């Protein structure tokens, strides 16, 4: 059977909204990690057969197939194509899946996967809610569909509503969420201070480290925040941060490894994606993880490290309750609550961090998953080599 290997992975630091990456064109963010990826791997860029990038809200500077634009903005060969993927927050994890599947199928040998996003310039959901207003289209992507309304009625379709439903279903208190959020900040700060992210990041201008972690946050400060929705328990403190950034990985076949003298760092062990209730939206990592473990014959205890996106604290806390995973193996260097969530780049960022942490700790198996719009979740399991 053909194998798909991760041979290189790199990311920018994650910038806060309006921070050090806020003025950067998203294609330049993508180009930055692509140039670094090629330089670190030493591969001939003309040998790359496709560039698969994740990106959401593809309007303005993020329109026009930003995978292709990023590659060309990096000064790399024009004969290499690119394609942009939108599986909502899982877009660049899906980009990795498509890249690996191309290699596993035997139709491709060397593919780049990644993602880029500038949320400072293009706010979340701008494309679905405001971009079409000049055309007289004021409804979101669901309200105008007769089929959708017949099936789901007029129930709210948004992340905050989904997060609140999860908190209520799994009996997760506001205090639980705030304690989890504080731990995320503490872990991220420790990782930065210990240099754990040094190998996986490439500075962008003066931005040399992730800007999101808050050294001065406390449970008392979190307790003083107002809920996002009146009467709810979800606050900004237990939500992921609006962010900017990019990440990229190089996926290679056994033949490409031999031909280009590459060193495989991890083997793609499993790829899958599952769907669930689109109104609750954010709980799909639970059944998706169960599905992946059943398919592979692995147990959750066999997984050395997990990166599950911290879109909201209850997403991870509910997943922990259902899977029985050891919290000390999950998001060990903090997550999106502290580090930020640059939407279309986050999936690739998570895998980049997971790979480097497996190497640092000597772990064997790593699992990545994340909630996605529409009630979906990708799961990727890799084996460190």
Model-identified regions with their sequence ranges:
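Condensing-enzyme catalytic core mediating Claisen C-C bond formation in acyl metabolism
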Residues: 1-24, 36, 142, 220-283, ...
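N-terminal extracellular/periplasmic Venus flytrap/periplasmic-binding protein-like
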Residues: 11-12, 23-32, 40, 176-259, ...
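Active-site-proximal alpha-helical scaffold in enzymes
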Residues: 86-117, 167-196, 248-255, 342-361, ...
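Flexible glycine-/small-residue-enriched beta->alpha junction loops
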Residues: 110-165
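Active-site pocket-lining segment
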Residues: 162-164, 197-200, 207, 269-338
């Amino acid at each position: 059977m053909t194998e798909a290997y991760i041979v290189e992975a790199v990311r920018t630091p994650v910038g806060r909204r309006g921070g050090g990456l806020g003025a950067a064109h998203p294609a330049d963010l993508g180009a930055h990690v692509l140039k670094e990826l090629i330089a670190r791997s030493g591969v001939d860029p003309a040998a790359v057969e496709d560039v698969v990038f994740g990106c959401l809200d593809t309007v303005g500077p993020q329109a026009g197939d930003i995978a292709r634009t990023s590659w060309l903005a990096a000064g790399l060969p024009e004969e290499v194509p690119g394609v942009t993927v939108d599986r909502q927050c899982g877009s660049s994890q899906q980009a990795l899946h498509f890249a690996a599947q191309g290699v596993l199928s035997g139709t491709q040998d060397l593919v780049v996967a990644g993602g880029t996003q500038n949320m400072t310039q293009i706010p979340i959901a701008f494309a679905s809610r405001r971009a079409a207003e000049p055309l007289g289209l004021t409804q979101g992507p669901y309200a105008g569909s007769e089929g959708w309304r017949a099936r789901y009625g007029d129930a709210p379709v948004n992340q905050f509503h989904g997060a609140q439903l999860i908190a209520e279903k799994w009996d997760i208190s506001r205090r639980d969420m705030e304690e989890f959020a504080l731990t995320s900040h503490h872990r991220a700060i420790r990782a930065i201070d210990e240099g754990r992210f040094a190998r996986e990041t490439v500075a962008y201008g003066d931005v040399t480290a992730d800007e999101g972690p808050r050294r001065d946050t406390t449970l008392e400060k979190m307790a003083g925040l107002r809920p996002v929705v009146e009467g709810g328990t979800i606050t900004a403190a237990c939500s992921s941060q609006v962010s900017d950034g990019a990440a990229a990985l190089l996926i290679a076949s056994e033949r490409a490894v031999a031909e280009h003298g590459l060193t495989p760092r991890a083997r793609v062990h499993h790829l899958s994606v599952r769907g669930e209730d689109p109104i609750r939206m954010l709980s799909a990592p639970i059944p998706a993880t169960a599905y992946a473990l059943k398919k592979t014959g692995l147990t959750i205890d066999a997984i050395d490290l997990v990166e599950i996106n911290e879109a909201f604290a209850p997403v991870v806390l509910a997943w922990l309750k259902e899977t029985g995973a050891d919290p000390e193996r999950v998001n060990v260097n903090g997550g999106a609550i502290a580090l930020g969530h640059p939407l279309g780049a986050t999936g690739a960022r998570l895998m980049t961090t997971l790979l480097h942490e497996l190497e640092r700790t000597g772990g064997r198996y790593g699992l990545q998953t994340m909630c996605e719009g529409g009630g979906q979740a990708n799961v990727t399991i890799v084996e460190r080599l």
